[in-house]
UniProtKB/Swiss-Prot annotation:
The keyword Cell inner membrane does not apply. Residues 1-13 have a biased composition (Basic residues). One of the primary rRNA binding proteins, it binds directly to 16S rRNA where it nucleates assembly of the body of the 30S subunit. With S5 and S12 plays an important role in translational accuracy. One of its GO terms (biological process) is ribosomal small subunit biogenesis. This is Small ribosomal subunit protein uS4. The gene is rpsD.
Length: 200
């Protein structure tokens, strides 16, 4: 299965949530796309609800099925609540960290920045979006990339801050302080549904 590159508005309308950020299309048409989007739909099965939650999470973080399942398997081997560990591992990806720090406007853009070698971790270029952050890792924009207008604009307009991250706009450098707690992660995801799906 290839990574989805189609209209993000359709995905947001399917899940009735702005999973890629503010969506004017969702505001105008807060119902699923398609000919029968506004019609009353029959009650979804338990499996359908669980599958939809998994798909929503995959789209939110930009993962393919194999990547997502591998991360779930890793979370299931960790001590603690599997669903919470899954979300924490998703948040600890380098592409997500670049997005949360405001270096990139979207996770898709963050993946591009990483893949195009604009991002450094502990002063070494890392071009793997799935790279897992560790506490006290320092993320920075490569010096030769700091003059890119798109990155400068993103950093300048960064608004949200997160307790597990530090960011110095002037230096274009931030720190992954520690793994976030579940309650600190703002995504509207019911991770227990995903655990139940994979437990079948």
């Amino acid at each position: 299965m290839a990574r989805y590159r189609g209209p993000k508005q359709k995905i947001a309308r399917r899940f009735k949530e702005p999973i890629f950020g503010p969506s004017k299309a969702l505001e105008r048409k807060p119902y699923p796309p398609g000919q029968h989007g506004q019609s009353r739909r029959r009650r979804e099965s338990e499996y359908a609800v669980q599958l939809k939650e998994k798909q929503k999470t995959k789209y939110t973080y930009g993962l393919l099925e194999r990547q997502f399942k591998n991360l779930f398997d890793k979370a299931s081997r960790m001590q603690g609540v599997t669903g919470e560990k899954l979300l924490i591992l998703l948040e600890a990806r380098l592409d997500n960290t670049v997005f949360r720090m405001g270096i990139a406007r979207t996770r898709r853009q963050a993946r591009q920045f990483v893949a195009h070698r604009h991002i450094m971790v502990n002063d070494e270029v890392v071009d793997i979006p799935s790279y897992e952050m560790s506490p006290d890792d320092v993320v920075s924009v490569k010096p030769s990339s700091q003059d890119l207008e798109v990155i400068q604009t993103n950093v300048e307009h960064r608004q949200r801050t997160f307790s597990w991250l530090e960011m110095d706009r002037q230096e274009m450098k931030g720190k992954f302080i520690d793994y976030p707690n579940r309650e600190e992660i703002p995504e509207n995801i019911d991770e227990q549904l995903i655990v139940e799906l994979y437990s079948k």
